[in-house]
UniProtKB/Swiss-Prot annotation:
Pfam families given in the database record: Radical_SAM, TRAM_2, UPF0004
E.C. number: 2.8.4.4
Key words of the record: 4Fe-4S, Cytoplasm, Iron, Iron-sulfur, Metal-binding, S-adenosyl-L-methionine, Transferase
Its biological purpose: Catalyzes the methylthiolation of an aspartic acid residue of ribosomal protein uS12.
Domain of life per record: Bacteria
Annotated binding of [4Fe-4S] cluster 2, by residue: 149, 153, 156
NCBIfam families documented for this protein: 30S ribosomal protein S12 methylthiotransferase RimO, MiaB/RimO family radical SAM methylthiotransferase
Name by which UniProt lists this protein: Ribosomal protein uS12 methylthiotransferase RimO
């Protein structure tokens, strides 16, 4: 009689980088014969991959750990919040193991301790696909190119959790990308803590892929990814000068004309307090130049309002900058102090919560008007749409200016008998728009 496969559940919180970590853990466990299940009652043990970026994320992590303990009882904790195990154990002393991010072997060993792998497991029978276990839909995947960050932004504690920049070998990254494309992935989302710093830590050394030399550098990586015939979308791009080299690749259709650049603010004073580059005037000139070279370019960004020391004048400067920049996709957060962040030690006036809320409301209204106007210009144009979902009401997809989960959608009505499926790319004509989404008809 064959022994029953041990079963593990996974809850992955936080950013796409953490999701990739969860995929790596599950891939290893699947290779050892574990079954991945979706419910507490079916799992022999539950792994919670936590987020510790801001206090609300920590609170959510603690809440989810508590729920897993209540519903299952056997819980292993990993991820960014696991850097300080004492905080987790103070609230949930019954957790079986606590580890920080990237500690894959320790997590797998902790699972072994709770529910050992089957001794009769035959890896030739329970084959794991070459691309590994993926927690995203089959048609898109995150491609993590590095870990850690060399910056010291005053509001952030990521370097203390994930360490300094460590770039993956370029050949390994491209091999993974090729496996993903071969498995049916239509969109690669390139992620890291600082995508444009890729290769800095290894002095852009030359690696090899498909027998050809390739520099460990963002531009060369993008050139190689652009040869694979799928959408390539760049996230978490820090605006170094060499980012300019990517624009011709976008204009030529090699990679998507989409840049996710977290500017965070525009006021020179606030940027200095944040320890961010304070070249907001040059940034506007660069954006103008980028769009002249690549008119289809979409720029997404995130900002923080209510940072210590932010005055009404600083905030108005930010709104005026947004008007000039005409960014396409924008997110905004109210500043929240993070334990251990250098910003807590700033000699700067704390912005009251009601003022933060007021500025957030005004920021969102201001940017919504900009986004709506920019999307209105898409009406009547033909666009290629990657389908994410299909139901009896039609299809929901994204075009090149929409990243999954964080940007807008394209809603498409389908005729009876349509064979459109998730993962298909179809041509559509835009018929309507609001501040976030588009409506279109299939051509």
């Amino acid at each position: 009689m064959t022994a029953k496969a041990p079963r593990v559940g996974m809850i992955s919180l936080g950013c796409p980088k953490a999701l990739v970590d969860s995929e790596r853990i599950l891939t290893q466990l699947r290779m050892e014969g574990y079954e991945v299940v979706a419910t507490y009652e079916d799992a022999d043990v539950v792994v919670v991959n936590t987020c510790g970026f801001i206090d609300t994320a920590k609170a959510e992590s603690l809440e989810v750990i508590g729920e897993a303990i209540k519903e299952n009882g056997k819980v292993i904790v990993t991820g960014c919040m696991g850097v300080d195990a004492s905080v987790i154990r103070a609230v949930h002393p019954s957790v079986l193991s606590v580890t920080g991010p990237q500690q894959y072997e320790q997590v797998v060993n902790a699972v072994h301790d709770v529910v050992p792998p089957r001794k009769d497991h035959n890896p030739l029978i329970d084959l794991v696909p070459p691309q590994g276990v993926k927690l995203t839909p089959r048609h898109y995947a995150y491609l993590k190119i590095s870990e850690g960050c060399n910056h010291s932004c005053s509001f952030c504690i990521i370097p203390s959790m994930r360490g300094k920049l460590v770039s993956r070998p370029v050949g390994d990254v491209l091999d993974e990308a090729k496996r993903l494309v071969k498995s049916g992935v239509k969109e690669l989302l390139v992620i890291s803590q600082d995508t444009s710093a890729y290769g800095v830590d290894v002095k852009y050394r030359t690696g090899f892929w498909d027998g050809q030399p390739v520099k460990t550098r963002m531009t060369e990586l993008c050139q190689a990814l652009g040869s694979m015939g799928v959408w390539v979308r760049l996230h978490y791009v820090y605006p170094y000068p060499h980012v300019d080299e990517l624009i011709p690749l976008m204009a030529a259709g090699k990679i998507l004309p989409y840049l996710d650049i977290p500017f965070q603010h525009a006021s020179p004073k606030i940027l200095k307090l944040m320890k961010r580059p304070a070249f907001e005037d040059k940034t506007l000139a660069r954006i103008k130049n980028w769009r002249e070279q690549c008119p289809d370019l979409i720029i997404r960004s995130t900002f923080i309002v209510g940072f210590p020391g932010e005055t009404e004048e600083d905030f108005q400067y930010l709104l005026d900058w947004l008007t000039e920049a005409q960014l396409d996709r924008v997110g905004c957060f109210q500043y929240s102090p993070v334990e251990g962040a250098p910003a807590n030690l700033l000699d700067a006036a704390i912005v009251p919560d009601d003022v933060k809320q007021d500025r957030w409301d005004r920021f969102m209204a201001h940017q919504q008007a900009i986004s709506a106007a920019r999307l209105q210009m898409k009406i009547g144009k033909e666009i290629e749409v990657l389908i994410d979902e299909v139901d009896d009401r039609g299809a929901v997809g994204r075009c090149f200016f929409d990243a999954p989960e964080i940007d807008g959608n394209v809603f498409i009505g389908l005729e009876d008998g349509s064979t459109v499926q998730p993962g298909d790319k179809i041509m559509c004509r835009v018929t309507d728009a609001d501040e976030y989404d588009l409506w279109a008809e299939m051509l």
